[in-house]
Amino acid sequence: MSMVVAKIDWRQLYNFASRQALLGFCFDGIERLTKEFSEELKQNPMGRDLLMTWMGAAQQIRRQNMKVNAVAGKLYSKFREDGLRCCILKGQGNALMYPNPYSRTPGDIDVWVNASREQITEYAQKHFEIGDDIRFHHLETSFDGVPVELHFFPGIMNNSIYNVRLQKWFRRNADLQCSNVVSLPDGIGEIAIPTTAFNVIYQLTHLYHHFFDEGIGMRQIIDYYHVVCDFYKVYQNSSKITPSLFTIKEGSTSHPDPLTLRGEGGNRPTRCSEPLRSKVGGPSKVSPNCAGWDRRGVSGDTSSVSCSSVSGSSITSVRSASTTDPSASTALVVVQRELKYLGLWKFAGAVMFVLHEVLGLAEEKMIVPVDEKRGRLLLAEILDGGNFGRHFTKYAGFTHQSMGKKYFLKIWRNMHFVRFYPAEALCEPIFRTWHFFWRMKNKK
């Protein structure tokens, strides 16, 4: 490692971090290097101008996180007080998994509201300023100067068969995600975020969709790295479980050992610091078959838990896959079956390759086996496109073209992926064309 530090091209690293929206994250790592490799840094110092520029960017990211955290907490409280159950997707919930939650570059606030499209739209028209262009799965607005997306459902897939399955999976899991309340850093407020078991599948669908849309960047990959590591902590502690047993264990946390933020002088906010509950309308209803085996109450030896011990109706662990196989008693097996059922298995293998090659994810933490062929393709797209494909040089730089040119360039790009992901790649232009006319029809 010392040889690597001594040869770092700081300007090149800065440019890479900027393209991938990782300036705060990388600067946090540089601060660690100054403590662990001070002698090597004396031999290869960063220029003062670059250091000050980078430090300023990191401080700005920190302030942005504080702003977005405050608005997210306020927005969540507003929905809760108005009787709507919701959770905050990705974003600030993901930041809580980072060693320094202020180092992640924030984006907009994605809110999944557990209500019908009509209810959400009517509520948004009364309480927010919204445009006339409403997307199929969300509408866009802002709150206290921060961009907000109100989701009718968390995500979509291009292939209609897999999309129907995905929406059923979302509906089955919605209630528990809106009950998973966590504290934000420095006591600034609290929000509901999805459980780890939900995120390990949901955030993969998010990456998959954006891969065919405009591309994904390293920031999203690092987010998913933390999700996978968090999931590993969950299922290794109690691998034999009953996925339909989701009663709550008081005071349980995803991070049982409090971690101290460097330089913050306080405890790191825990991601599951409170028992699951609905603060509106009494106790939440725990959905059967939901992705919440990371927030369960199990007494005694969990290896002795069986489906027969669950009170009420007999529920299979992977109902969407139509199986009653008792071998699906581990969290990892359940996730793998869901990935296959939702058409995500091959892409998951590609992501595991990137997580291993770039971030050093250990094999025992992987949710599926590595797919090197698809993984190298994914990594090449990430490195060329940068954050959400904004820096593509190939495909005629399609993300910077006019709407008409972009339409055909996207088709051309996705045809490169047909032999790797035929179902999603072939359906992408069909879905995009349908979505265009749907938006025209539903303009307010």
Question: What are these language model-derived features?
Answer:
Residues 2, 43, 155, 177-187, ...:
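Intrinsic disorder/low-complexity segments
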Residues 1-107, 112-237, 329-444:
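Conserved NTP-donor binding/palm subdomain of two-metal-ion nucleotidyltransferases/polymerases, i.e.
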